[in-house]
Amino acid sequence: TIAVALAEGSQRGAVCEHRQISNTPAALTRLATKLSQTGSVLRFCYEAGPCGYGIQRQLTAAGHDCAVVAPSLIPRKPGDRIKTDRRDAINLAKLHRAGALTAVWVPDPAHEAVRDLVRARLAAVRSLRQARQQLSGFLLRHGHHYSRPAWTLMHRRWLAGLRFEQPAHHIVLEDCIATIEAATARRDRLTAQIETMLENWALAPVVHALQSLRGMALVSAATVIAELGDITRFANPRQLMAYLGLVPSEHSSGGTRRQGGITKAGN
C-alpha cells in the first residue's frame, strides 16, 4: 500500500493524512483524478525504493509533476525514533512544499534497461568470483595447491586430473567446476549482450569517448555511463565527484578545518 499525505500550497497551509491506497496503477489514477477535481496544481513526491520509477512515469505521463526523493538526503530531526508510513508521508509533504527535498535523476526506460543489463553482468561477475573462492577453499582444506596462475587452461586441466580418496569429495569438485563454468558462460553471454545493446544506445558515443582513457575498456565505460546517466546534469566536475563520493569528508568549525576520508556517497 501507499500512504498519502496532502500539504496545501501556502507555507502555513494544512498538512493532513489523506488515505492509504493500493500500490497499483488503477488506484494511483483514481487518486490523481480525484485530487485534480479542485483545479489545484498537483506536485507529487515519493521515496526512491524497490518499486522503481513506475509511479513517477505514470504521474508524469498524466501531466503531473512528480519527484523521486533520495531517502539518504531527507532531513530528519535528531532523536526522532518513531517511523511509520503515515509519519513519513506527512513529513515528505511538508518538506516537498518547503523545497527541502533532493530529487534523484530518473532515467528513461531505454537507459534503465541498459543499466539493468550492466548490473546483471556485475551480479554474474560476483557469482563467478564466489564460486571460484568456494573451490579454492575446498582445495585448500584438502591439501591441493596450484602454484601457477589460476583459472587458465592449464589450471583447468590440473583440476580435471585431481583425485580424492573419498568419492564424495570428487562429487563436490565436479559440482564446483560445473558451477564455475556456468557462471563464466553467464558472464560472457551478458558481456556480449552489452556490446550488442550499445550499438543502438543514445549514449554510445559517450561510452566510446570514455574508452580513450587508459585502462577503460568497453564494459567498464558502459558501466560508468549506465550508472551516472546524463553527465550534463552536473554543473561542474566538483559536483560529479561529490555525487560519486570521491570528495573528502569534512568536520570544520570556526577557523579549524578538519578533513577525513572520502564520503563514499556513490554506489
Residue ranges and their predicted role:
Residues 1-267:
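A detector of single, family-specific signature residues
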